[in-house]
């Protein structure tokens, strides 16, 4: 089986530092506001993102519309490749807003899986378009998103962003990972607020890291955290 030889990484990653010591006190209010149908999120979708979304759907349909996995914020795409190898009966769409990251050498040894595509798109638009199109991904990953650790940056984190209800509405098995425990605790809290679920934050130590960040954080001795939620069943996975 093909495997990924990650590029050399200097082990000098510092833990996230923040004045915030727990779930943000404004999170519940913000999540409720964003879920309020009388205050819809009206940011226009750009033509570029619409074309990118349509192209990714065309690739999925051309591959037979296998059960879908979304790897959102996939960076250089290593996680997308790993997910495609691990789930050969699924189709994986790796989405990132940076053309530079998507174009980098991923150091993947052996043949690349064919059950995937990469698309450059803004996630805020992509998630809303996916919801509008009625997509129901089987699995949905947010791996090590930008933590925005300053207290005043809550609204920049996905759980504090107006797009969060669209992420949840897509359903499926949703997984978020981070090396900042508070980020995952907030993500979990926001999920529970929207769904009435009892999802949990858990410590996470993978047998094989699937992103450069995951490998770097592990090698630097960071604790890793994740939330896994089966949104269709309403139960923690």
Description of each model-found segment:
Residues 2-68, 78-85, 107-134:
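S-adenosyl-L-methionine
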Residues 72, 95:
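Conserved beta-strand/loop positions that form the S-adenosyl-L-methionine
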Residues 73-77:
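Class I SAM-dependent methyltransferase "Motif I" SAM/SAH-binding loop
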Residues 98:
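Conserved SAM/SAH-binding beta-strand->alpha-helix loop
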Residues 155-163:
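Charged helix-capping and loop-helix junction motifs
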Residues 170-178:
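Conserved beta-strand signature within the Rossmann-like core of class I S-adenosyl-L-methionine
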Residues 183-190, 194-237:
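Class I S-adenosyl-L-methionine
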């Amino acid at each position: 089986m093909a495997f990924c030889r990650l590029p050399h990484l200097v082990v000098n990653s510092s833990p996230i530092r923040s004045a915030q010591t727990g779930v943000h006190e404004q999170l519940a209010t913000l999540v409720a506001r964003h879920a309020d149908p009388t205050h819809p999120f009206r940011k226009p979708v750009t033509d570029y993102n619409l074309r990118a979304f349509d192209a990714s759907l065309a690739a999925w349909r051309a591959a037979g519309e296998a059960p879908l996995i979304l790897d959102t914020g996939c960076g250089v795409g290593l996680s997308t490749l790993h997910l495609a190898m691990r789930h050969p009966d699924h189709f994986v769409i790796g989405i990132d807003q940076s053309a530079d990251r998507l174009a980098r050498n991923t150091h993947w040894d052996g043949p690349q899986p064919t059950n995937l595509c990469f698309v450059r798109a803004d996630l805020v638009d992509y998630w809303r378009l996916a919801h509008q199109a009625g997509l129901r991904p089987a699995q949905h990953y947010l791996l090590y998103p930008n933590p925005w650790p300053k207290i005043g940056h809550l609204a920049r984190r996905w759980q504090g962003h107006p797009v969060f209800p669209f992420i949840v509405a897509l359903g499926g098995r949703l997984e978020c990972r981070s090396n900042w425990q508070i980020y995952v605790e907030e993500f979990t809290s926001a999920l529970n607020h929207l769904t009435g679920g009892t999802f949990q934050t858990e410590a996470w130590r993978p047998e094989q890291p699937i992103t450069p960040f995951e490998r770097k954080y592990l090698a630097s001795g960071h604790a890793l955290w994740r939330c896994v939620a089966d949104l269709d069943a309403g139960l923690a996975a």
